[in-house]
């Protein structure tokens, strides 16, 4: 068979007040290379031992749920997306699994169908839609119906501060309240609305201001990511637009003017020496599939 390669970008979600709705694709990638058929699924990887190497692997289990009749294959998986750091590692695996089923099962899924299926697996569209479409996405899940709008943000630079500590999404969600007062919801929703409008109109200073005024989740997660206020203060002093938790954390996501991203990243690295400071870009392509006779990662 002609080798098949799937590349899925990482993503950051929320961007402050866009909780479970706004996502941005990032220039870190999960690669899946599909090799020969086999009598059972085999996943070759160099991750920690807790990541399955059989049909229990998230990529494979997702693919088999989408297309139960798939023939088992050997696949090789590599990734520079940190696990359980709020950069969409599980979402990228789900998206890769859907595309694996699409390619091997000849499903001819549309982009909208991929987003719908991925959102059903993930429970919210922000990470998965960003990984599929690239760029910045704003999405909503209403029952089983998903609506997603994609916008370009090519003038922006991205910096991620990644701690050594992991933070499980379930743990980070457990600190969120079950009930949100109506007046707080109105205030939080208004801030989110302005964030989205500013993203669409490329008013980056307003974007930065709104992404630091979340009421939905960041106030409750501060105990899990105590460095956020000091990182936010320094980033602003160094010329960044704004700072927010990346997804559920613990990574921190910073938007900057594109031309200043390297300078700001270097300044932050000198201050926050316990964290890995990554100068990233927004990925504008989304998931890509390559069918060539010679594929290298």
Swiss-Prot record:
Gene Ontology annotations of biological process type: threonine biosynthetic process
Name of the top EC class for this enzyme: transferase
GO molecular function: ATP binding; homoserine kinase activity
Enzyme Commission (EC) number: 2.7.1.39
Function as written in the Swiss-Prot or TrEMBL entry: Catalyzes the ATP-dependent phosphorylation of L-homoserine to L-homoserine phosphate.
Domain of life from the UniProt record: Bacteria
Residue sites binding ATP per the record: 82-92
Pathway linked to the protein: Amino-acid biosynthesis; L-threonine biosynthesis; L-threonine from L-aspartate: step 4/5
Origin species: Bacillus cereus (strain AH187)
Compartment list: Cytoplasm
Keyword Kinase: yes
GO cellular component: cytoplasm
Catalyses which reaction(s): L-homoserine + ATP = O-phospho-L-homoserine + ADP + H(+)
Designated name of the protein: Homoserine kinase
Keywords for the protein's UniProt record, in alphabetical order: Amino-acid biosynthesis, ATP-binding, Cytoplasm, Kinase, Nucleotide-binding, Threonine biosynthesis, Transferase
UniProt family annotation: Belongs to the GHMP kinase family. Homoserine kinase subfamily.
């Amino acid at each position: 068979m002609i080798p098949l390669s799937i590349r899925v970008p990482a993503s950051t979600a929320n961007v402050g007040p866009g909780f479970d709705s706004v996502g941005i694709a990032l220039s870190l990638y999960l690669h899946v290379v599909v090799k020969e058929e086999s009598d059972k699924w085999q996943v070759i990887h160099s991750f920690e031992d807790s990541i399955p190497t059989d049909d229990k692997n998230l990529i494979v289990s997702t693919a088999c749920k989408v297309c139960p009749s798939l023939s088992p294959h050997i696949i090789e998986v590599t990734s520079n997306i940190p696990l359980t750091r709020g950069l969409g590692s599980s979402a990228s695996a789900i998206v890769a699994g859907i595309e694996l089923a699409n390619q091997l099962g000849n499903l001819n899924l549309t982009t909208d169908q991929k987003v719908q299926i991925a959102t059903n697996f993930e429970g919210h569209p922000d990470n998965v839609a960003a990984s599929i479409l690239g760029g910045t996405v704003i999405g909503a899940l209403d029952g089983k119906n998903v609506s997603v709008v994609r916008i370009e943000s090519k003038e922006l630079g991205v910096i991620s501060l990644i701690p050594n500590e992991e933070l499980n999404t379930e743990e980070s969600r457990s600190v969120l309240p079950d009930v949100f007062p109506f007046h707080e919801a109105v205030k939080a929703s208004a801030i989110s609305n302005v964030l989205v409008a500013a993203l669409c109109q490329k008013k980056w200073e307003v974007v930065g201001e709104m992404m630091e005024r979340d009421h939905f989740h960041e106030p409750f997660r501060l105990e899990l990511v105590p460095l956020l206020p000091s990182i936010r203060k320094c980033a602003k002093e160094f010329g960044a637009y704004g700072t927010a938790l990346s997804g559920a954390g613990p990574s921190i996501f910073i938007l900057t003017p594109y031309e200043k991203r390297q300078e700001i990243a270097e300044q932050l690295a000198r201050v926050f020496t316990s964290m890995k400071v990554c100068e990233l870009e927004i990925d504008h392509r989304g998931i890509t599939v390559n069918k060539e006779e010679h594929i290298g990662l």
